[in-house]
Amino acid sequence: MQRQKIRIRLKAFDHHMLDQSAQKIVETVRRTGADVAGPVPLPTEKEIYTILRSPHKDKDSREQFEIRTHKRLIDILEPTPKTVDALMRLDLPAGVDIEIKL
């Protein structure tokens, strides 16, 4: 018999908000009696944008900006219906992107 598993991937630009959200999910799942693996930190994506400082000249003078996307992975092993219901009711910040795979 195959074990049922829910995999949750969290993404956010702010790692403090991401860690708080992951902690909320882990506490909620443990309260309902399911096993949790994680949160596992995944590699951070770093996007770098280079633009010219001046609108007309000085190609040598440039400025760089970056956006870091932090990611976490949480596995819920053998979830109960109570676990799924508690996760549906969980209120997480708007800055955290959540992907759930069954």
UniProtKB/Swiss-Prot annotation:
Gene3D superfamilies reported for this sequence: Ribosomal protein S10 domain
GO molecular function, one term: structural constituent of ribosome
Keywords: Ribonucleoprotein, Ribosomal protein
GO biological process: translation
One GO CC term, this protein: ribonucleoprotein complex
The keyword Lyase is annotated on this UniProt entry: no
UniProt signal peptide: none
NCBIfam families in the record: PRK00596.1, rpsJ_bact
Family: Belongs to the universal ribosomal protein uS10 family.
Role: Involved in the binding of tRNA to the ribosomes.
HAMAP family: Ribosomal_uS10
UniProt subunit comment: Part of the 30S ribosomal subunit.
Official protein name in the record: Small ribosomal subunit protein uS10
Protein species of origin: Desulforudis audaxviator (strain MP104C)
